[in-house]
UniProtKB/Swiss-Prot annotation:
PANTHER family: 39S RIBOSOMAL PROTEIN L10, MITOCHONDRIAL. GO terms for cellular component: large ribosomal subunit. This is Large ribosomal subunit protein uL10. InterPro entries: Ribosomal_uL10, Ribosomal_uL10-like_sf, Ribosomal_uL10_bac, Ribosomal_uL10_bac_type, Ribosomal_uL10_CS_bac. Forms part of the ribosomal stalk, playing a central role in the interaction of the ribosome with GTP-bound translation factors. GO terms for biological process: translation. It comes from the Bacteria. Keywords: Ribonucleoprotein, Ribosomal protein, RNA-binding, rRNA-binding. PROSITE patterns: RIBOSOMAL_L10. Transmembrane segments: none annotated. Belongs to the universal ribosomal protein uL10 family. The gene is rplJ. Disulfide bonds: none annotated.
Amino acid sequence: MSAIIEAKKQQVDTIAEQLKNSVSTVIVDYRGLTVAEVTELRSQLREAGVEYKVYKNTMVRRAAEQAGIEGLDEFLTGPTAIATSTEDVVAPAKVIAGFAKEHEALEVKTGVMEGNVISAEEVKTVGSLPSHDGLVSMLLSVLQAPVRNFAYAVKAVGEQKEESAE
């Protein structure tokens, strides 16, 4: 086999492994963005722990097939970049949805969450959700509220009894 074909097979294997290991993937069309804007997007994604790469559509198509992800073919037209995260489910969608609001040239094509293809609208919806840490803190504040309110009530009753005792 020629070295070029071997290199392409290796790249397909790498992309397939990346798709299998990621908890969420967002596929975008970056056409129309300036180099500075793409650099800014890459920087924001890197800070969020998201890997962002541009691949040829045929490579992604073969890698998706190898990874067992069906339904991506219709979205793999034109320039394609893939943002994947192995840790935070919301991070790629959050960063890209926020960036797309500021830069209309960035078009969300589709996403993959837990092996299922989701629409661009669903990616934007996921992007509007708080992060895992944000959700945990919201849950904790909801759980603490009754205890905190009870403590305030006990304190108020205690202060009221002190005033009446004087």
